[in-house]
């Protein structure tokens, strides 16, 4: 794998996808995301042998949004283990990421930890398990990624608080069903802070490289999580990482991954690499149009996927 010239492949892909440049639009329901240049494009691939391949705006920081939910799930599994799955499921949702209808029908148990309701439950677990939830989660993110400079972005977090009515509704509904154990405002403060983190593609590829290396971050040699739980997280990313478009991503790309409405996608090839792509224009499902196309072309050209 290390003999592949990914940088050359990136250039080929960008040239081939020039017709996709104007497709999609940036997220506008979170004011801070609406101000992003829609034409940015960055990508960074880091191999488990510490090779780096970058293209374009790979060192442009952007709001990773729902991608950060991978960290909260990882930390919840470290604390609660398999009991986590009594509070949240492992099935694709098939509905919008902030749907109330499915949640009510299923008695307040979210389908998976990556839709909003599921991530809110995971944050509730962390509020119960951690002495100082916001500080302890941030410390875990910094140490597991090997990037001590990671911070919450208070401007983005406040922007989400002001527009997060649906998330408050989800949390209160689950509270009514007994699946939120702590104060709703406290839980959502952690949730909004988590989703406010900004990283570059280069940082993001490093941060999630542990999922390509059996739970060990090659940059720090830290065992972030066990190989067994690494497998579980990758499986959920494969099935549930792209809102109601997870099947499409699995079909066309063939890698576990997670998207965010900030325009980022991180994808993992276990045993080989982690790649992050950033392009802010989104499709109707909230996934980056161009980032999905880039990753589809990458696995097609390299003939490397998990299938």
Swiss-Prot record:
Q: How does it assemble?
A: Homotetramer.
Q: What is its EC number?
A: 3.5.1.2
Q: Which PANTHER family match?
A: GLUTAMINASE (PTHR12544:SF29)
- Originating organism: Saccharophagus degradans (strain 2-40 / ATCC 43961 / DSM 17024)
Residues that bind substrate? 66, 116, 160, 167, 191, 243, 261
- Which SUPFAM superfamilies does this UniProt record tie to the protein? beta-lactamase/transpeptidase-like
Q: Which UniProt keywords apply?
A: Hydrolase
Q: Where is the signal peptide?
A: none
Q: What is this protein called?
A: Glutaminase
Recorded family membership:
Belongs to the glutaminase family.
Catalysed reactions, semicolon-separated: L-glutamine + H2O = L-glutamate + NH4(+)
A UniProt-annotated Pfam family = Glutaminase
Give GO terms: molecular function aspect only.
Answer: glutaminase activity
The GO biological-process annotations, alphabetized, read as:
glutamate biosynthetic process; glutamine catabolic process
């Amino acid at each position: 794998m290390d003999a592949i010239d990914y940088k050359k492949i990136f250039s080929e892909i960008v040239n081939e996808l020039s017709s996709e440049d104007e497709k999609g639009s940036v997220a506008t329901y979170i004011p801070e995301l609406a101000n992003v240049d829609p034409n940015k494009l960055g990508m960074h691939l880091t191999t488990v042998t510490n090779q780096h391949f970058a293209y374009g705006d790979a060192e442009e920081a952007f709001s990773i949004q729902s991608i950060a939910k991978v960290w909260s799930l990882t930390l919840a599994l470290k604390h609660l283990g398999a009991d986590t799955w009594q509070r949240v499921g492992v099935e694709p949702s098939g509905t919008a990421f902030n749907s109330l209808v499915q949640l009510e029908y299923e008695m307040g148990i979210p389908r998976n930890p990556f839709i909003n309701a599921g991530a809110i439950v995971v944050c509730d677990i962390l509020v119960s398990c951690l002495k100082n939830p916001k500080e302890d989660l941030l410390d875990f993110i910094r140490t597991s990624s090997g990037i001590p400079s990671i911070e919450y972005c208070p401007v983005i977090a406040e922007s989400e608080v002001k527009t997060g009515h649906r998330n408050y509704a989800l949390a209160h509904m689950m509270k009514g069903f007994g699946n939120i154990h702590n104060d709703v405002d406290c839980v959502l403060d952690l949730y909004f802070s988590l989703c406010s983190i900004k990283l570059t593609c280069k940082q993001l590829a490093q941060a999630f490289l542990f999922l390509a290396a059996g739970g060990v971050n090659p940059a720090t040699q830290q065992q972030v999580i066990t190989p067994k739980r690494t497998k579980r997280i990758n499986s959920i990313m494969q099935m549930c990482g792209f809102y109601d478009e997870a099947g499409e991503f699995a079909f066309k790309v063939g890698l576990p991954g997670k998207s965010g409405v900030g325009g980022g996608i991180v994808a993992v090839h276990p045993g080989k690499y982690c790649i992050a792509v950033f392009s802010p224009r989104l499709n109707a499902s909230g996934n980056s149009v161009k980032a999905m196309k880039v990753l589809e072309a990458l696995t097609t050209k390299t003939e490397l996927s998990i299938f």
